[in-house]
UniProtKB/Swiss-Prot annotation:
Belongs to the GHMP kinase family. IspE subfamily. The active site is at K12, D138. InterPro entries: GHMP_kinase_C_dom, GHMP_kinase_C_sf, GHMP_kinase_N_dom, IspE, Ribosomal_Su5_D2-typ_SF, Ribsml_uS5_D2-typ_fold_subgr. It comes from Nitratidesulfovibrio vulgaris (strain DP4). This is 4-diphosphocytidyl-2-C-methyl-D-erythritol kinase. ATP binds at P96, H97, G98, A99, G100, L101, G102, G103, G104, S105, A106. Gene3D superfamilies: 3.30.230.10, GHMP kinase, C-terminal domain. It catalyses: 4-CDP-2-C-methyl-D-erythritol + ATP = 4-CDP-2-C-methyl-D-erythritol 2-phosphate + ADP + H(+). Its EC number is 2.7.1.148.
Length: 286
C-alpha cells in the first residue's frame, strides 16, 4: 500500500437505547436499535508509516493522538492476529465530538475493517465483532453498518428491517458536549435499571406502520440524567416535537437530538428554524 487510502466513516443514531445492567467487569449490557447515517462523517487518510505500528494525527483538540479509538482498534487487531503493518492515519473530523453519534466508534470500525481487508490471514467477521466490542459498545454495529438491534455489551448484532421509508430524519447537533464516561457514571449513580419487553421491531417484521407514535417505542435510558444536567437538550427535543415531529429522542449519551417527520415540509421548516441557533442540522430522507 504505497498510495493514500481514504476511509470514510459515518455516524449513527439510537432509535431505542436501554442500559439493562452493569456487569462485574464494569461493562454495561445494552439493548439498542441502531440506524447508520452517512452525514456527518469523518475521514481517515491512511498511508504507509516508517515502522510497524500506527501513528495518528488530528487537528481537533481533545483527541489524544497516542490513545484513541483508532489506536485501540489497531492494537486489538494486532494482538489478535500478529499483523502489525506500519500505518500513518490523519483523522479529519466531521462528526461532532461528544454528540452521542458514535464518531469515534465508527473510526475504530473503519480501521478494523481496513486491517481485515489487507491482512494476509483475516480474522473473520465473528472475531472482528468480538474485538470491536472490547473497544466500545457501538463499534460492532459499525462493522456491519446496517440497521441493527444490538444486545449484550454491543457484540450481539441482529440486522432488522427498517419500516419507515419516506420519513425524514432531522439530526440536530448543538454546541454541547456530553462525555460518555460521565453519562454512564451518572446513570450508575442513579441506579437506573430499566427492562422492558419490546415487540415493535423484530428481525422478521414490524408493527403496523400506522401504529408509530411519539411514545410507542422510542426510549433512551440516558435522557433523565443528561437532561438533568443539560436542560437545553430537553428544550431542543420539545422544540422538534412542536415543529410536527412524529417522534424525537436524544441519541446515545447525547448531546445530539434527532426527530422523525412524516411530512418533509415539516422537517424543512424545523431545519430552517434550528440552523440559525448555532446548531448543526442534517436532513436524511429514510
Amino acid at each position: 500500500m504505497n498510495d493514500a487510502v481514504t476511509l470514510r466513516s459515518g455516524c449513527k443514531v439510537n432509535l431505542d437505547l436501554h442500559i439493562t445492567s452493569r456487569r462485574d467487569d464494569g461493562y454495561h449490557e445494552i439493548d439498542s436499535l441502531f440506524l447508520p447515517l452517512d452525514e456527518p462523517h469523518d475521514e481517515l487518510v491512511v498511508t504507509v508509516g516508517d515502522a510497524p505500528g500506527i501513528t495518528v494525527t488530528c487537528a481537533i483538540q481533545g483527541i489524544d493522538p497516542t490513545r484513541n479509538t483508532v489506536t485501540r482498534a489497531y492494537d486489538a487487531y494486532a494482538e489478535a492476529s500478529g499483523f502489525r503493518p506500519p500505518l500513518r492515519v490523519e483523522l479529519r473530523k466531521g462528526v461532532p465530538h461528544g454528540a452521542g453519534l458514535g464518531g469515534g466508534s465508527a473510526n475504530a470500525a473503519a480501521i478494523l475493517n481496513h486491517l481485515e481487508s489487507i491482512a494476509p490471514h483475516p480474522l473473520g467477521r465473528e472475531t472482528l465483532c468480538r474485538l470491536a466490542a472490547r473497544i466500545g459498545a457501538d463499534v460492532p454495529f459499525f462493522i456491519h453498518a446496517v440497521p441493527c438491534r444490538a444486545s449484550g455489551i454491543g457484540e450481539i448484532i441482529t440486522p432488522v428491517a427498517w419500516p419507515y421509508k419516506g420519513f425524514t430524519l432531522l439530526l440536530a447537533c448543538p454546541q454541547v458536549q456530553v462525555s460518555t464516561a460521565w453519562a454512564y457514571g451518572a446513570l450508575d449513580a442513579a441506579e437506573e435499571k430499566q427492562l422492558r419487553v419490546r415487540g415493535c421491531l423484530t428481525t422478521g417484521g414490524v408493527a403496523d406502520r400506522n401504529s408509530f407514535s411519539r411514545e410507542s417505542w422510542l426510549h433512551n435510558s440516558f435522557e433523565p440524567v443528561v437532561f438533568a444536567s443539560h436542560p437545553e437538550l430537553r428544550s431542543l427535543k420539545e422544540a422538534l416535537l412542536r415543529h410536527g415531529a412524529a417522534a424525537a429522542l436524544m441519541s446515545g449519551s447525547g448531546a445530539s437530538v434527532f426527530a422523525l417527520f412524516r411530512r418533509r415540509e415539516d422537517a424543512e421548516a424545523a431545519f430552517e428554524q434550528l440552523k440559525g441557533h448555532d446548531i448543526r442540522v442534517y436532513q436524511h430522507l429514510l
